[in-house]
Amino acid sequence: MTLLTVKHLTITDTWTDQPLVSDVNFTLTKGETLGVIGESGSGKSITCKSIIGLNPERLGVTGEIIFDGTSMLSLSESQLKKYRGKDIAMVMQQGSRAFDPSTTVGKQMFETMKVHTSMSTQEIEKTLIEYMDYLSLKDPKRILKSYPYMLSGGMLQRLMIALALALKPKLIIADEPTTALDTITQYDVLEAFIDIKKHFDCAMIFISHDLTVINKIADRVVVMKNGQLIEQGTRESVLHHPEHVYTKYLLSTKKKINDHFKHVMRGDVHD
């Protein structure tokens, strides 16, 4: 069953009249993971943020975005707020930017839960701890009492994921959630998303420029370049049998980097 339909989506900078995204079309079914790939500036993040109205006001959006039967572009800001978190959760690229540095992460998470649920304080704490345990965050009560600066980037990222899961959304949008992390933490966070894909009944849009990450988690893939969606299809078709020259370029570039790394590790590279 289709959960999200995006038709003829166009995003324009109203200050300059410059189109940033042009005529983008894609769908997402319930429980499916859609990978969105492209280089920086390709329009992938603003395309996905437009689903829940998180772009700056200067960006004008036209077209059609239908989420679970509702026209998202026709909603007011107050109506959109009811969807954010509860129905559509977003995991940002940098956990440090998602939390207010002046108060504890627990207080912020509790406030979000109170806005979107009718749970008591005790129920909220129990639910958050349950998902923090699920994401291997040790000593959750201590973490909830901590300020953001006291926690690592990986821990903050997993806290965002825990909060998203606690709200039981129909869709999680993950905007390059592994980019700002070290390699080991990247692996842990990616494994968490893969596990969510297996055990939770929610769709995901996973934005990344890392083809390895997308290959591990996506069911279908869309490729963006200069604000246009240039190719889409199953993970197998796009990443292993691409048709567009740009997709082929991305894959060949990644292969060259991987081959060079293998040569270096074997000691084959000389000055």
Curated annotation (Swiss-Prot):
Q: What is its EC number?
A: 7.2.2.-
Q: Does Nucleotide-binding appear among the keywords? A: yes
Where is this protein found?
Cell membrane
What are the entry keywords?
ATP-binding, Cell membrane, Cobalt, Cobalt transport, Ion transport, Membrane, Nickel, Nickel transport, Nucleotide-binding, Translocase, Transport, Zinc, Zinc transport
Mainly resides where? membrane
Q: Which domain of life, per UniProt?
A: Bacteria
UniProt GO MF annotations: ATP binding; ATP hydrolysis activity; transmembrane transporter activity
| UniProt entry tagged with the keyword S-adenosyl-L-methionine | no
Q: Which family does it belong to?
A: Belongs to the ABC transporter superfamily.
Q: Output this protein's name.
A: Metal-staphylopine import system ATP-binding protein CntD
Source organism per entry reads Staphylococcus aureus (strain NCTC 8325 / PS 47)
Q: Which gene encodes it?
A: cntD
